[in-house]
UniProtKB/Swiss-Prot annotation:
An annotated GO BP: killing of cells of another organism
The organism of origin for this protein: Odorrana ishikawae (Ishikawa's frog)
Predominant cellular place of this UniProt entry's protein: secreted
Entry keyword annotation includes Cytoplasm: no
Keywords: Amphibian defense peptide, Antibiotic, Antimicrobial, Cleavage on pair of basic residues, Disulfide bond, Fungicide, Secreted, Signal
Record's function text: Has antimicrobial activity against Gram-negative bacterium E.coli ATCC 8739 (MIC=12.5 ug), against Gram positive bacteria S.aureus ATCC 6538 (MIC=3.1 ug), methicillin-resistant S.aureus ATCC 43300 (MIC=25 ug), B.subtilis ATCC 6633 (MIC=6.3 ug) and against fungus C.albicans ATCC 90028 (MIC=100 ug).
Expression by tissue: Expressed by the skin glands.
Residues of the signal peptide: 1-22
Name this polypeptide is given: Esculentin-2ISa
Record family assignment: Belongs to the frog skin active peptide (FSAP) family. Esculentin subfamily.
Disulfide bond annotation, renumbered to this chain: C72-C78
Localization (cell): Secreted
Length: 78
């Protein structure tokens, strides 16, 4: 019974803390009207777009190198 009380007290304590943290974040978002969130999304989308571009370029170059190597081996010019 003692361990059950202990675990319930721990769950209540953690729930109270998480609820207060959520309330603080909500109040902070209300004060600045979500401007920080928009900046984070803008930066993330910029990084995501750059990563896609780099991946696409690297894959294209790797494909060219692979095709050139295959053509070289097929024609025995290596």
């Amino acid at each position: 019974m003692f361990t059950l009380k202990k675990s319930l007290l721990l769950l209540f304590f953690l729930g109270t803390i998480s609820l207060s943290v959520c309330k603080q974040e909500r109040d902070a978002d209300y004060e600045d009207k979500g401007e920080v969130e928009e900046v984070k999304r803008g930066i993330f989308s910029l990084i995501k777009g750059a990563a896609k571009l780099i991946t696409k370029t690297v894959a294209k170059e790797a494909g060219k190198t692979g095709l050139e190597l295959m053509a070289c081996k097929v024609t025995n010019q290596c």
